[in-house]
Amino acid sequence: MTSLFFEYTFPLIIIALKVVAITVPLILCVAYLTYVERRVIGLMQLRRGPNVVGPFGLLQPIADAVKLLFKEPIIPTNSDRILFILAPMITFILSLIGWAVVPFAKGLVLADINVGVLYILAISSLSVYGIIIAGWASNSKYAFLGAIRSSAQMISYEVSMGLVIITVLLTTGTLNLSGIIEAQRTIPWWIDLMLLPMGVVFFISVLAETNRLPFDLPEAESELVAGYNVEYSSMGFALFFLGEYANMILVSAMTTTFFLGGYLPPFNISWLDCIPGFFWFAFKVGFLLFCFLWIRATLPRYRYDQLMRLGWKVLLPLTLFWVVLVSSVLMYTDHLPSV
């Protein structure tokens, strides 16, 4: 009986503890990212932001969570009740399970699988289903139009995002996210310089993927009231909200992993190795999240035709050309990784 416990039950307990250790801090980070966003945008607009609930407004996310938790969930009369309830759950769960393959530091990863890149792409592709189901189940033309916009936008920019990732795979030779980070220790500086434009394209693509400004067409308030979540209140709205911000942190972590060296120090200086890798990872992710907030505070919303033109007529040809360019240069200079 003891051997059965150690062989089957004990590993499951360890996995459950790891999941809790990732999920709980992530939800706290998501809650306080909303606070940081309101403070940063307030400063950029020369106002204070939240400053009443607790010292410096630090308890504002908790007050918001309590308010949403105790509000009455209202389900529209002619909606599909089951799908209406399931949609925000799907969106929130998918935003969490992507973290399973993210390496926070050397050896600090829940599932160090050899197809981590494919796993991330699969999760990002599935996230559109929660939004589509929410728009359709709400039985509202505004919600449905927002969901259609979101699906078209996410599918359009996933193409260029996938091609950008191919350029990274050409230089690193692995689908394992930890392997991609470790490969960046030895990549020549000129290859990093060649990947820099693709890093910018990837960041633009994930802005569209997460429906953030200047690409927040699915929830354009002036046109669609609130988009696909217009009929949601209480915890349904909260789960969509948490999912959006968890996805923001996830795509920032992916950008860090692919282009900024993940948990590696930014410079090859010996004393920087004394600082834990998790600190560097968190610092880089925090910088990218600040860029998200900066863009939201400064840039206007694109028109929908401009959004699609940018995705299909600018970013897609550019990434296709860059895949050919990178592969040709790597082959000519004999820097193609051995797989």
UniProtKB/Swiss-Prot annotation:
The record describes its membrane topology as: Multi-pass membrane protein
User: According to its UniProt record, where is this protein mainly located?
Assistant: membrane
User: Membrane-crossing residues?
Assistant: 10-30, 50-70, 82-102, 115-135, 161-181, 187-207, 235-255, 275-295, 310-330
Calcium found in the keyword field: no
- Top-level EC class: translocase
Record Pfam families: NADHdh
What's one GO BP annotation on this UniProt entry?
A: aerobic respiration
Enzyme nomenclature, EC number: 7.1.1.-
Q: Any idea what job this protein has?
A: NDH-1 shuttles electrons from NADH, via FMN and iron-sulfur (Fe-S) centers, to quinones in the respiratory chain. The immediate electron acceptor for the enzyme in this species is believed to be ubiquinone. Couples the redox reaction to proton translocation (for every two electrons transferred, four hydrogen ions are translocated across the cytoplasmic membrane), and thus conserves the redox energy in a proton gradient. This subunit may bind ubiquinone.
HAMAP family listed in its UniProt record: NDH1_NuoH
Q: What is this protein called?
A: NADH-quinone oxidoreductase subunit H
Species this protein is from:
Rickettsia canadensis (strain McKiel)
Starting at the broadest rank, the lineage of the source organism is: Bacteria, Pseudomonadati, Pseudomonadota, Alphaproteobacteria, Rickettsiales
